[in-house]
């Protein structure tokens, strides 16, 4: 390591001291549920939860996609075959695994009354085939759904995770040592079609480093690069929620249903409890006052587990009625 920025700027003669490789495999993401569609539309398309559901509603009503309020990641057999067939046609036979992929429930309370969100029909229309028929926002959301569905039936991406150890000699003769870790992809698989987004502010630098792509280098290889600059780092507080991350948190805590995620976010924004600063959701002073009041006088009803317990009680009631 370097102790000062002046020493850093003097470094030259960089070379690779060692390369440690470990096998890397990455599976495609499951087809869309309501919550994951809202999260991806927020990250990739900058659509709010309300807008993404309005656009999805139009696509569904006009016969372009299946029902958009669902907590299931399962596809019908016809949809699985359509996705595999289209992946083979577009990306080659190697892009599809020998057996169809089956995805497990995201959580135990998933009702799975409908299949996952996907292009409609037993033979998918490509984005290029429907572009002239759709409005720009409809086309972008359809393309996102189509890519995710096709990719969900494609082969794993494969490669290796490399840890590089580098050394360099400064002009004053001191030895500087560095290390870098990242992923080298040797077979793209589903990445040819689609790569799942992430909320960078929430996942942080560790997740970014895990999937950082490195060039292929060999031990002893001489390297060139930009001038080295030493920078300081400080611990940051937890990031504010975005629409994507708050939907994920609602689902994780089993608060609400797929049909209530977008209305819940819309309600707290319409009432002035939160506002948007960039993509972040920032609470107002009114929100703090309301939360304090509710916690003091209605603690039972604002407990995070209340909804899950109520759902369980309703399920038990239905069982007793059926008996």
Residue positions per predicted region:
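Single conserved hydrophobic/aromatic residue that forms the stacking wall/gate
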Residues: 1-8, 12, 319-323
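N-terminal alpha-helical segment
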Residues: 4, 33-34, 310
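Short Gly/charged-rich anion-binding patches and loops
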Residues: 7, 36, 54, 245, ...
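Basic, low-complexity terminal or inter-domain segments flanking catalytic cores
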Residues: 15-16, 20, 48-50, 68-322
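C-terminal accessory/connector segments of nucleic-acid motor ATPases
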Residues: 19-55, 242
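Short alpha-helical scaffolding segments that buttress acidic/His motifs in well-ordered protein cores
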Residues: 55-56, 145
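Eukaryotic nuclear/nucleolar intrinsically disordered, charge-dense low-complexity regions
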Residues: 62-65
């Amino acid at each position: 390591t370097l102790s000062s920025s002046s020493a850093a700027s003097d470094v030259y003669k960089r070379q690779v001291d060692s390369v440690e490789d470990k096998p890397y495999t990455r599976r495609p993401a499951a087809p869309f549920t309501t919550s994951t569609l809202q999260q991806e539309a927020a990250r990739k398309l900058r659509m709010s939860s309300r807008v993404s559901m309005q656009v999805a509603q139009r696509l569904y009503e006009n016969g372009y996609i299946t029902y958009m309020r669902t907590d299931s990641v399962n596809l019908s057999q016809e949809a699985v075959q359509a996705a595999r067939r289209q992946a083979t046609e577009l990306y080659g036979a190697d892009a599809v695994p020998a057996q169809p992929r089956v995805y497990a429930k995201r959580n135990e309370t998933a009702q799975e009354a409908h299949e996952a969100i996907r292009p409609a029909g037993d033979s998918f229309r490509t984005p290029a085939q429907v572009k002239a028929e759709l409005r720009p926002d409809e086309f972008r959301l359809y393309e996102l759904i189509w890519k995710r569905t096709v990719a969900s039936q494609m082969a794993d991406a494969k490669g290796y995770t490399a840890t590089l150890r580098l050394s360099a000699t400064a002009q004053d003769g001191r030895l500087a040592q560095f290390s870098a870790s990242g992923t080298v992809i040797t077979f793209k698989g589903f990445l040819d079609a689609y790569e799942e987004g992430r909320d960078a502010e929430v996942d942080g630098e560790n997740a970014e480093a895990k999937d950082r792509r490195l060039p292929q280098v060999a031990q002893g290889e001489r390297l060139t690069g930009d001038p080295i600059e030493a920078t300081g780092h400080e611990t940051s507080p937890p990031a504010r929620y975005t629409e994507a991350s708050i939907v994920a948190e609602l689902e994780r805590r089993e608060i609400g249903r797929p049909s209530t995620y977008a209305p819940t976010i819309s309600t707290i924004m319409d009432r002035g409890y939160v506002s948007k600063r960039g993509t972040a959701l920032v609470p107002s002073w009114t929100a703090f006052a309301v939360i304090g009041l509710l916690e003091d006088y209605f603690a039972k009803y604002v407990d995070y587990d209340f909804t899950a317990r109520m759902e369980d009680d309703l399920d038990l009631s239905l069982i007793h009625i059926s008996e």
